[in-house]
Amino acid sequence: MTTVIYPGTFDPITNGHMDIIQRSAVLFSKVIVAVAKNPSKQPLFNLAERVELVQLSVVHLGNVEVIGFDDLLANVVKARQIDAIIRGVRTTMDFEYESQLAHLNRLLTNGVESLFLPPTEQWSYVSSTIVRDIFLHQGDVSRLVPAAVLRALEKRAK
């Protein structure tokens, strides 16, 4: 059984994230979506809310588990005996940054590899930052996020 982890802040989870999760769920026995608490970011949704939104978004995927974490990713990888780290890369800038993290994670986990998945073309422009910006300017994000996220955003707007 191959277990992979897909870490991120997912603030909020987007259809681009869902693309990576769904494709990973086909490729691997188990996918753990690890929702990170990042003290250097001011999130739109707190950690518990983000975990819940991801859970609601992946409920149809039987081999996907969602966890929240505020530890070093390498520690989570070692504790859960993860086989590989999944990262989505949209641009060459993403690739350069993720390559640095992959080298560090490989060192800190005694060899666990990072696998880079580009998004399908349909979602190559979508990011949580863009979704938040559109939402904060009262734009329509309904085609960019799962239904549970849209409901949470609409509730937040009231």
Curated annotation (Swiss-Prot):
A UniProt-annotated Pfam family: CTP_transf_like
Binding site for substrate: T9, K41, L73, R87
Class of enzymatic activity (EC top level): transferase
Source domain of life: Bacteria
The protein's annotated pathway: Cofactor biosynthesis; coenzyme A biosynthesis; CoA from (R)-pantothenate: step 4/5
Localization of this protein: Cytoplasm
CC per GO annotation: cytoplasm
Cofactor: Mg(2+)
Protein keywords: ATP-binding, Coenzyme A biosynthesis, Cytoplasm, Magnesium, Nucleotide-binding, Nucleotidyltransferase, Transferase
Catalyzed chemical reaction(s): (R)-4'-phosphopantetheine + ATP + H(+) = 3'-dephospho-CoA + diphosphate
Gene Ontology terms, MF aspect: ATP binding; pantetheine-phosphate adenylyltransferase activity
EC number: 2.7.7.3
GO biological process: coenzyme A biosynthetic process
Primary location recorded for the protein, binned into one broad class: cytoplasm
Site (Transition state stabilizer): H17
Residues involved in ATP binding: T9, F10, H17, G88, V89, R90, E98, W123, S124, Y125, V126, S127, S128, T129
Function text: Reversibly transfers an adenylyl group from ATP to 4'-phosphopantetheine, yielding dephospho-CoA (dPCoA) and pyrophosphate.
Subunit structure: Homohexamer.
Matching HAMAP family: PPAT_bact
Family: Belongs to the bacterial CoaD family.
Protein's recorded name: Phosphopantetheine adenylyltransferase
Organism: Histophilus somni (strain 129Pt)
Gene that encodes it: coaD
